[in-house]
Design a protein with these regions (language model features):
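Active-site neighborhoods and metal-handling regions in enzymes and metal-associated proteins
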Residues: 1-150
Length: 150
């Protein structure tokens, strides 16, 4: 939740890193990799989302939430791995005009994330997948999801 609610244009990568690690950085539920990165070829080459990063997130960035708790034990846990993009007001307006059907799906996903999952996304966060912020508590029960209490 902290990853999605902190994500915004102008946020420093280190701030996003700290938001996640302040909640999951303990010895048992530690994060095995960085908790987010750019997508495609940039996934393993460079990430603005790392400890101490001063790189600001910008409009046009396609990012992946990549929160994989690594217990270091025989116990496994569920994880969130999905992509979003950041778009400033002008880009969102242009996208909505050029691709109204896609825009309506993005808006429906954002509404679901807000109203059903209880996560407050910043307006510049565009969700392109139905998996965004969907966290099943058990691997074998993908139809269940964790939500924030009101």
């Amino acid at each position: 939740v902290a990853w999605y609610e902190t994500l915004a244009i102008g946020v420093k990568g280190g701030e996003l890193y700290d938001a996640v690690m302040s909640r999951l950085g303990d010895p048992f539920f530690g994060i095995g990799l960085n908790p987010g990165h750019l997508i495609h070829l940039d996934e393993w080459l460079h990430s603005p989302i790392r400890k101490g990063s001063t790189m600001k997130l910008a409009s046009g960035m396609a990012l992946q939430c990549d929160v994989i708790p690594a217990t270091g034990t025989d116990y496994f846990t569920t994880n969130i791995e999905d992509g979003v993009a950041l778009a400033d007001h002008a880009t969102r307006k242009q996208f909505a005009t050029q691709y109204p059907e896609a825009w309506s799906r993005i808006e429906a996903r954002r509404k679901f994330i807000r109203d059903k999952l209880g996560i407050k996304l910043n307006p510049e966060v565009l969700t392109f997948s139905n998996l965004a912020a969907w966290l099943p508590p058990f691997w074998l029960s993908p139809g269940m999801a964790m939500v924030m209490s009101p």
